[in-house]
């Protein structure tokens, strides 16, 4: 099967290598000329994922060349670039390929999920791939399980057949809204978990953050039409666990730096790659206001990131809130 992967960051590189191992004809598209020259000459992508890139994977900066005759096109760019790449795809698309989206985020200007943005430009079936999946582990063939979601289950089944092997297991879920929100909103809680680590707090604090974070993710998700059970699956609690606990998580690492006293700008500069939770915090905070959903952790992380609130004060605000029943609002 011919499959195009658009975006040569960590995840795009990893999924291209994974699919190449399965015997597919893979084209990896990127637009950075320097990165293109580096990969072509060294077969390494040093900044993002410094592993051998097989010679069988075609590398190109020509989008039309990349997608021509492809049966599946994988969008593996950061969420803020999904609109631009979708618009360009519309201009060059030559057949009704399946779109697989890997980006986890909510567009800040429109508050739309990534599949909604893509559907503005393309009539193709869109399949969302989400779940606990560090690129660094997938490329090393560490056993990983993720979830696929689409309005068309048959499209999910095509992707499931094409992407699965003994090290990469994929389940199908019809709840597109829940799968996308779970993958996006957990990054906010991961920032909080990192801030907690940076402040020197312990496992009790992190467990509370993750559990109560899942509660507010579920509240917003249900308000937006999700099945609450989705958040107990791979795209919810699964992704939340890995992102809040692993040092491979950019969101957690950025949070640690902020907890240790660095500004948001300093933390992002040190990470050197996109930290999706930053923009998602803006989007989720606005959605919580619009839909009148109680999201206290998101509110405090927003205050730390964008209003200069001291993290210790944010923790105090959370711990001294009015008394509640645990399942309040769910």
Curated annotation (Swiss-Prot):
Top-level taxon: Bacteria
Pathway: Membrane lipid metabolism; glycerophospholipid metabolism
Keyword Nucleotide-binding: yes
Subcellular localization(s) per the UniProt record: Cytoplasm
One GO BP annotation of this record: glycerophospholipid metabolic process
Pfam families cross-referenced by the UniProt entry: NAD_Gly3P_dh_C (PF07479), NAD_Gly3P_dh_N (PF01210)
UniProt-annotated binding residues for NADPH: 10-11, 31, 104, 135, 250, 274, 276
Keyword Nucleotide-binding in annotation: yes
Binding sites annotated in the UniProt record for sn-glycerol 3-phosphate: 104, 131, 133, 186, 239, 249-251
GO molecular function: glycerol-3-phosphate dehydrogenase [NAD(P)+] activity; NAD binding
Catalyzed chemical reaction(s): sn-glycerol 3-phosphate + NAD(+) = dihydroxyacetone phosphate + NADH + H(+); sn-glycerol 3-phosphate + NADP(+) = dihydroxyacetone phosphate + NADPH + H(+)
Gene3D superfamilies per the UniProt record, alphabetical: N-(1-d-carboxylethyl)-l-norvaline Dehydrogenase, domain 2, NAD(P)-binding Rossmann-like Domain
Keywords: Cytoplasm, Lipid biosynthesis, Lipid metabolism, NAD, NADP, Nucleotide-binding, Oxidoreductase, Phospholipid biosynthesis, Phospholipid metabolism
GO terms for cellular component: cytosol
E.C. numbers: 1.1.1.94
Biological function: Catalyzes the reduction of the glycolytic intermediate dihydroxyacetone phosphate (DHAP) to sn-glycerol 3-phosphate (G3P), the key precursor for phospholipid synthesis.
Name of this chain's protein: Glycerol-3-phosphate dehydrogenase [NAD(P)+]
Gene: gpsA
